[in-house]
Curated annotation (Swiss-Prot):
Main subcellular location: other
Signal peptide positions (record): 1-30
Name recorded for this polypeptide: Type IV pilus biogenesis factor PilY1
Species whose genome carries this gene: Pseudomonas aeruginosa (strain ATCC 15692 / DSM 22644 / CIP 104116 / JCM 14847 / LMG 12228 / 1C / PRS 101 / PAO1)
Disulphide bond pairs: none
Gene name, Swiss-Prot/TrEMBL: pilY1
Family: Belongs to the PilY1 family.
Domain of life: Bacteria
Annotated Ca(2+) 1 binding sites: D598, D600, N602, D606
One GO-annotated biological process of the protein: type IV pilus-dependent motility
Amino acid sequence: MKSVLHQIGKTSLAAALSGAVLLSAQTTHAAALSVSQQPLMLIQGVAPNMLVTLDDSGSMAFAYAPDSISGYGNYTFFASNSFNPMYFDPNTQYKLPKKLTLVNGQVQIQDYPAPNFSSAWRNGFTRSGSINLSNSYKVTIEYGRGYDKESTIKADAAYYYDFTGSSSCNRTNQACYTRRYVSTEQRQNFANWYSFYRTRALATQTAANLAFYSLPENARVSWQLLNDSNCNQMGSGSSSGNCFSNYLRDFTGQHRVNFFNWLEKLSVNGGTPLRQAMTRAGEFLKKTGVNGPYAYRPGTQTAPEYSCRGSYHILMTDGLWNNDSANVGNADSTARNLPDGKSYSSQTPYRDGTFDTLADQAFHYWATDARPDIDDNIKPYIPYPDQANPSAEYWNPRNDPATWQHMVTYTLGLGLTTSLTSPRWEGSTFSGGYNDIVAGNLSWPRASNNDSNNVYDLWHAAVNSRGEFFSADSPDQLVAAFQDILNRISGKDLPASRPAISSSLQEDDTGDKLTRFAYQTSFASDKNWAGDLTRYSLTTQDKATVQTKLWSAQSILDAMPNGGAGRKIMMAGSGTSGLKEFTWGSLSADQQRQLNRDPDRNDVADTKGQDRVAFLRGDRRKENSDNFRTRNSILGDIINSSPATVGKAQYLTYLAQPIEPSGNYSTFAEAQKTRAPRVYVGANDGMLHGFDTDGNETFAFIPSAVFEKLHKLTARGYQGGAHQFYVDGSPVVADAFFGGAWHTVLIGSLRAGGKGLFALDVTDPANIKLLWEIGVDQEPDLGYSFPKPTVARLHNGKWAVVTGNGYSSLNDKAALLIIDLETGAITRKLEVTGRTGVPNGLSSPRLADNNSDGVADYAYAGDLQGNLWRFDLIAGKVNQDDPFSRANDGPAVASSFRVSFGGQPLYSAVDSAGAAQAITAAPSLVRHPTRKGYIVIFGTGKYFENADARADTSRAQTLYGIWDQQTKGEAAGSTPRLTRGNLQQQTLDLQADSTFASTARTIRIASQNPVNWLNNDGSTKQSGWYLDFMVNGTLKGEMLIEDMIAIGQVVLLQTITPNDDPCADGASNWTYGLDPYTGGRTSFTVFDLARQGVVDSKSDYSYNKQNVAVSGTEQKGLGGLTLSTNEQGNPEVCSSGECLTVNPGPNTRGRQNWRPIEGKN
């Protein structure tokens, strides 16, 4: 069997345990990118403590469950999964566990060797003993306590029994079973089961192995057993016997390998002293010092001890506690004050009538502050909010409001389900008889030493510690249970819950000089990832722009009748429109299979797909039942998608007409004057939405690339670390000519939502058509579609979508994709070179129209390795008289499109230490002051991997301006190898708090060093400039990830600085207005910091005894900048937090862009 080999990388717990990342972990390579499925500004960066307790009692040697069937080992039906759930199930795939080794300091993972059917190991971990399953097989009853016990039935070829009787047939009636010999196709699966799953111990070893092998490196893990004296002390560091140094350490390197070695060598014997194990785990959390659970780097560095670090205990057993003691009294029935000042009085579902139970211990270690000397900053986990009744919310055991250092315990019982009858177990912690406990109709059974009621104590303990209980009876259920526990922990390692965050502001074109309108998107993680699109009117009051709310798409959609039955939700189809309704009956068999998966149970197949379709359409009847989550609104979170408005024609007629002389743009534009306006925006509910100007949803589209994870939106755990991105890209709208007519086309991208692009013809909003979709099946080098596409007319006479290939593609390459707008065919893929073994991908391009005729000539884009590339989109004729001619050069010219400069970058961005600086935002272009070529302005920074959530204060990110002199269509076979030494440095010299006409602001002042472009003889002296994002040499982790705006003699940009406190979420933003020709301070005032509606000296700052222009100001809001015009006709730049009037400078040259045809998006 082919093994899977890869290395482990760092990521966040929540991301690593989300389904998509977990499933892909087996095939990723060493340098794989960890694309976050959480908004990074909400992620807190402290990994949890995970304490693992496994049962090594003698009963773990049993090859059956439950204990009550022990006397049936010599009966035929003992070999039936229907009677003995531990036995081979032909419908289950028994995966090989993973073998971890340390090679040259790197953890390597591969499958354990597959057992041979004719010589299968009795223990696949130790590869000891063997049996020929083709002729010498006997059913195992017990294995692993120094002796083996097998059925007395005669040895034979491996077999199993199917239950073939009627439903009334007694399960101990041998006539109800039919013997099946293992077929040739089943042999490997049976051998895997025999060697790695057939006993409780083997199944536990394998299940834990498969769950933990993909756990991220920054999780901190310790382990213990119940009995083994060498390994029954949590975090002791014991290396005796087979404990392999169980100190609490980061789950990396040798410590990671030690954990799997410990699993491999598990031996069984003795009783079930669970309470002592619980005590050891709880008391360990009180430990101080370098080996304590809150040490910064356990074993190396104690301080700082982060007060937001959660701690989780996983307790697995197959039996009932016995032969031990606890000393906490009747903790769950005794009144007490909690560390946050709340008072507890005996109440359901916590209380019972027994002392010193496992449940008492669990409550004690939840309610006690393990480290009162540390601040209480654990994040509350409230997946079931109840604003109307805060007390009920606090005491709901599904929530964990504790902010103090405490222990949450997850319990896992093996082979115990049939004993859970009163209260009745129905598959999950908070269902079945649990409701009778809450209502007071039942009490928790009294637990005592070796009592059969102790099985309920496992359930009760999970409730008391705000964890969960899992009951498994078969190996496959055990594998799923371990994985579910890690998924639940990842849900508590969730992004911070935040109220509505405004993420984008976009004006529309339906207003006039007196009233303007704008759309604002927002999301609220504290409301189960609710999203909204709000329309505002914009007016000026007291010289400031005032927003007046007109409607909320969220409210209108939630008020929709009939559970979403009337919504027009479309997906790819085969009709003339290329679309079909999203209904259960319209789905293919494979699509129905994808929706028939339970996201809360590791995608186990179920039959709820039709209900999931109804849920996604807006039907709310299944919420908070049937394991479907509760939504605060139907509209999902809108985080990175900026709305695009479509009303009148996109271009000015006199500019558009010459591009396509055969088309009559004026006629098209006249027809669009009466087109019903629409606003389109993507949301993380799986859809692109279209709304009219009254806020009614008129259209929604589900891209094929997100379909495979639509079912996750129904998950109970979605409110935590299970959040996913879907249609998170900003739609791009443009008018284009194809098929003999003008059309209005929308290009959609997904960002972290998936690897896909789509094009819709939205010319007629009542008759939208799907032009095409592109995914990895069509283009393997397509990664997550973070880059923003551009629609352009090219020299081959075709309209095209030009975009970067995105990140985390199959081969981690970077390439410019040129896609035929009409058909979706890849016209050209221009692949660039890069460093091998380092992930790469091309970011958003900026197109240049050198002669302003509306046809793109060049494209500029950066990549993750810090290279700035130029692409020539012109014919390859060196002596062509007019390489930029609008004339159609014919389809063949596309073969001449190429990577400029002989395949070399225009510039490679590195910091002062020589480390590459990733480029993820589109460059901006301005004409060089000499009128020769462009200054290509770009910034560096990356903000989409989990590790990017925390500020990197070890290095600076940078804004560059690089002179590209070879822009006359010449055959540019090479470019000068530029370094920082060829550039003029600018600096941020001052950050200060100041007041401008009663408006308080924090501002920055940049240097104003001139750039000496030319020597006296006309040769090049300096080739550009750079500005490191740091104030007076202080690094804050500031970076540029949003597109810039070049207007007149100023370049406007917004940076982001992640929070450098790992116990805090959020990010800060700075808006800059700089001189694009020098990268420094402008000679004129840029921002209306005094909020007057005009820009004058009242917004200047006194610096070095003179009034100077402010270079940057801190602003609230996310999503980059939008350029608009205020009521006085002056330009203004808007973030999601506020709008600032800007001055583009004296004798402005107007907007610099790739072409004079401007879209409204």
